[in-house]
Amino acid sequence: MAAARAVARDPGAYARQPPSLRAARLPRLLFLLAVVAAVGPREGGGARLYREGSDAVWLLDSGSVRSATGNSSAAWLVQFHSSWCGHCIGYAPTWRALAADVRDWAAAIRVAALDCAEEKNQDVCRTYDIHFYPTFRYFKAFTKEFTTGENFKGPDRELRTVRQTMIDFLQNHTEGTWPPACPPLDPIQSSDILSFMDSHSGQYHAIVFESNGSYVGREVILDLIPYENIMVSRALDTDKAFLGTLGITSVPSCYLIYPNGSHGLVNVAKPLRSFFSSHLKSLPDVRKKSLFLPEKSNKEEKSEVVVWKEFDRAKLYTADLESGLHYLLRVELAAHRSLAGAQLKTFRDFVTVVAKLFPGRPAVKKLLETLQEWLANLPLDKIPYNAILDLVNNKMQISGIFLTSHVKWVGCQGSRLELRGYPCSLWKLFHTLTVQASTHPEALAGTGFEGHPQAVLQAIRRYIRTFFGCKECGEHFEEMAKESMDSVKTPDQAVLWLWRKHNMVNSRLAGHLSEDPKFPKVPWPTPDLCPACHEEIKGLDSWNEGQVLLFLKQHYSRDNLVDAYSVDQGSPGEWEAQGREQEEGKGLNPSGKSWRHHDTGSLRPPHILGPRTDLSKSLHHRLDLRLQSPQGPQALKEAKAVVPFLGVGFSSLDMSLCVVLYVASSLFLMIMYFFFRVRSKRWKVRLYHPAV
C-alpha cells in the first residue's frame, strides 16, 4: 500500500527506477493500485472544492437545487462556482470558514455551493442565468414560484461582509416568508425589557445592547437558535438613562435575566460576538435542541483516483486542445441560452479565427469550418445555443466531422483534478492561434482579419470578456489588454505580447491556492526547455526575445503536435463510455435528456458508422429497450421521433414539415401563375384597323 501511495504522490518516481526493478515490481504495483482504486478516497483526489462530511457547506446539484431552495422553511445563500476557476479555488477557504461560522444558523439560512463545471449541472446553471464565477444568489424562504434568486450586494466578499449581508437578507423577509425557526431580529424597547424582568418565564433571557450599526446582537441571536431554555434579544443604546440604571457604561454589552428573576451584566473578557455566544451556550440547563433539518450526508464521498499520463513537456498534445474546445463549446458556452448582438458577433469572430488557424486533426478542423460557415451564412440576429450544440454534436451526420465528447488532459493534467485543466488548455489554444497567424497569415484571407496584426488577440480578448466563466480572470486580462495591446503592430509582436502577459499572470498567481505544486508557476519557457531563450545581462537573468519567438513558433507548430492519448473518431472507448453514461443516467440534465444528441452515433462520421441498416437496427434496439421501461407509450413516441427517415438523418416530423412546405409552395406558385395569366390578357395591345 505504501508503494501505491508513493506512486500516486510522485507520478515520476516510478519512471526514474531502473528497468529491472520496475519489471520486478510491476505486477505488485498494478495489484496495489487496483486495490487502492477500489477502496476509494485519495488525498486531494477529488475535483470538488467542497466535500460532504468535512465541510459545513451544503452541496447542491442539478437534481437538488430546486427542491432545496423552493418552498424551503429556511433561506439559502448559494455560491454557483466552477472548480477550475482560479478565483473560486482561492475563495473556497473563505466560503468553508463562513459555512462553519454560521453552522448554527442553518434553521434560518443555509450556506450552499453548486459546481457549474460539472457537465450534469450545465443546464441548471443556464436556467439560473449563471454566466460568471463565482456568482452568489440569495433565495428567500417559502418561495413557491421558481426564481433565479437575488444577487449578492456587498462592498466586498470578506467573511464578515457576507455574514452581515446574510442578516440583512433575513430581515428583508416579510411576515409570510419569515423562517419559523428564526427569532425576531428587530430591537426591543426599554418597556419590553422591564416586562421581561417581571415575567419570571422560567428560562434565561439575554439582551445584547449595541449601537445602531452593530451586528453583534443579531449574530448572537442567530448563534443561539439551536439551543433551548434561553431567549436572546437586542436593544439599542438610545435610552442612556435606562442603560445607566442597568449599570451599562459601554456597548456592546450583554444583560442576562435568570430563570429565577434575578438579572445582571454578563462579564466577558472581550465584548465580541464569540465571547457572548460562548458564555450563553455554557449556562446551566442551556443545551442543544432537536431541529428538523433536511438530511445532510455526514459521509465523506469517495474521490476519483487521478490516473497519471506520462507526457513530454516539450510537446503540444492534441488531446489538450480538443478537450479545451469540447469544454468551451459544450459546457462554457451552454451558460448562454441564446446569442445575439455583440455576443453573437464575438462568438462568430472567435470561431472564424479558430476554424482558420486550428492546426489539429482534419475531422476537428472540418467541424470548426462547418460551424464557421454556418454562422457566417446564418441570416439571423439571434440564435439559440441548442442550435450550435446540434451542429457540434453532428446531429445531421455530416461526413468526416468529429469532436471528442469528454475531457482528457495530458500536458494540462494536474496533480489534483481541479488544478490546471481547462484554463491551461485555453492558454495553449490562444498561443497556438497567435503562432499560426504569424507563420500562416494566408489562412485568414477572405475573413476580414487579414492584414490586422491584432485580429487574433482582439478576438481572444472579446471572447474572454464575454464568455470566460472566471469573472476576475477576465477582468485582469482586460486590464492587460487596455494597457498595451494597442502597441502590437506585427503578428510576431502579437505572439510575444501574449507570451509576456501569460508570464505576468503566472507571476501574479505564484503561491496562490490554484497553483499546482507539481507544476509551479515560474517564467516560461524554463532554461531546460529553451537554453537559448535565457541570457545574463549585468548579472541579471534576461530574455532573448528573438530566441523566445523562434521557440514559440516551433513549440506551437503543427509539427510539434502529438496525437497520443487523443480519442479516435471510431474509438470503442469513446462510444462505450457514452453508452454507459446513457444507461447509468450520467451527464443528464434535470429534464432527463442527455446533453449529447439522442443518437450517440451521430457524433461519428457516417463512413465510420457503417451501413445505414446497422444504424437503423441500433435505433430500433434502443427503442425496444425503452419500450420495456416504465415510460412505455411515451417512450415509443419519443423514440419514433428520432428514427432517421430513409437513413438520411431526418426525423418523421422533419419530413412532415417538408411535405407541408412543398404543398404550400406549389399552391402558391399555381395561384400566382393564374393571377398573372389573367392580368396579362388585359395588358395585350389591341390593334384596330381603320374603317374605309
Curated annotation (Swiss-Prot):
<dbReference type="GO" id="GO:0005654">
    <property type="term" value="C:nucleoplasm"/>
</dbReference>
<feature type="binding site">
    <location>
        <begin position="499"/>
        <end position="506"/>
    </location>
    <ligand>
        <name>FAD</name>
    </ligand>
</feature>
<feature type="compositionally biased region" description="Basic and acidic residues">
    <location>
        <begin position="577"/>
        <end position="586"/>
    </location>
</feature>
<feature type="binding site">
    <location>
        <position position="420"/>
    </location>
    <ligand>
        <name>FAD</name>
    </ligand>
</feature>
<feature type="active site" description="Nucleophile">
    <location>
        <position position="85"/>
    </location>
</feature>
<dbReference type="Pfam" id="PF00085">
    <property type="entry name" value="Thioredoxin"/>
</dbReference>
<dbReference type="InterPro" id="IPR042568">
    <property type="entry name" value="QSOX_FAD-bd_sf"/>
</dbReference>
<feature type="disulfide bond">
    <location>
        <begin position="470"/>
        <end position="473"/>
    </location>
</feature>
<feature type="domain" description="Thioredoxin">
    <location>
        <begin position="54"/>
        <end position="172"/>
    </location>
</feature>
<feature type="glycosylation site" description="N-linked (GlcNAc...) asparagine">
    <location>
        <position position="260"/>
    </location>
</feature>
<dbReference type="InterPro" id="IPR013766">
    <property type="entry name" value="Thioredoxin_domain"/>
</dbReference>
<feature type="binding site">
    <location>
        <position position="521"/>
    </location>
    <ligand>
        <name>FAD</name>
    </ligand>
</feature>
<feature type="disulfide bond">
    <location>
        <begin position="530"/>
        <end position="533"/>
    </location>
</feature>
<dbReference type="Pfam" id="PF18371">
    <property type="entry name" value="FAD_SOX"/>
</dbReference>
<comment type="similarity">
    <text>Belongs to the quiescin-sulfhydryl oxidase (QSOX) family.</text>
</comment>
<feature type="binding site">
    <location>
        <position position="524"/>
    </location>
    <ligand>
        <name>FAD</name>
    </ligand>
</feature>
<feature type="disulfide bond">
    <location>
        <begin position="412"/>
        <end position="424"/>
    </location>
</feature>
<comment type="function">
    <text>Catalyzes the oxidation of sulfhydryl groups in peptide and protein thiols to disulfides with the reduction of oxygen to hydrogen peroxide. May contribute to disulfide bond formation in a variety of secreted proteins.</text>
</comment>
<dbReference type="GO" id="GO:0005794">
    <property type="term" value="C:Golgi apparatus"/>
</dbReference>
<keyword id="KW-0732">Signal</keyword>
<dbReference type="GO" id="GO:0016971">
    <property type="term" value="F:flavin-dependent sulfhydryl oxidase activity"/>
</dbReference>
<dbReference type="Pfam" id="PF04777">
    <property type="entry name" value="Evr1_Alr"/>
</dbReference>
<dbReference type="InterPro" id="IPR036249">
    <property type="entry name" value="Thioredoxin-like_sf"/>
</dbReference>
<feature type="transmembrane region" description="Helical">
    <location>
        <begin position="656"/>
        <end position="676"/>
    </location>
</feature>
<keyword id="KW-0325">Glycoprotein</keyword>
<feature type="binding site">
    <location>
        <position position="476"/>
    </location>
    <ligand>
        <name>FAD</name>
    </ligand>
</feature>
<keyword id="KW-0285">Flavoprotein</keyword>
<feature type="glycosylation site" description="N-linked (GlcNAc...) asparagine">
    <location>
        <position position="212"/>
    </location>
</feature>
<protein>
    <recommendedName>
        <fullName>Sulfhydryl oxidase 2</fullName>
        <ecNumber>1.8.3.2</ecNumber>
    </recommendedName>
</protein>
<dbReference type="InterPro" id="IPR017905">
    <property type="entry name" value="ERV/ALR_sulphydryl_oxidase"/>
</dbReference>
<dbReference type="InterPro" id="IPR040986">
    <property type="entry name" value="QSOX_FAD-bd_dom"/>
</dbReference>
<feature type="disulfide bond">
    <location>
        <begin position="116"/>
        <end position="125"/>
    </location>
</feature>
<dbReference type="GO" id="GO:0016020">
    <property type="term" value="C:membrane"/>
</dbReference>
<feature type="binding site">
    <location>
        <position position="472"/>
    </location>
    <ligand>
        <name>FAD</name>
    </ligand>
</feature>
<keyword id="KW-1015">Disulfide bond</keyword>
<dbReference type="Pfam" id="PF18108">
    <property type="entry name" value="QSOX_Trx1"/>
</dbReference>
<dbReference type="InterPro" id="IPR036774">
    <property type="entry name" value="ERV/ALR_sulphydryl_oxid_sf"/>
</dbReference>
<feature type="region of interest" description="Disordered">
    <location>
        <begin position="568"/>
        <end position="607"/>
    </location>
</feature>
<feature type="binding site">
    <location>
        <position position="427"/>
    </location>
    <ligand>
        <name>FAD</name>
    </ligand>
</feature>
<keyword id="KW-0274">FAD</keyword>
<feature type="glycosylation site" description="N-linked (GlcNAc...) asparagine">
    <location>
        <position position="71"/>
    </location>
</feature>
<dbReference type="InterPro" id="IPR041269">
    <property type="entry name" value="QSOX_Trx1"/>
</dbReference>
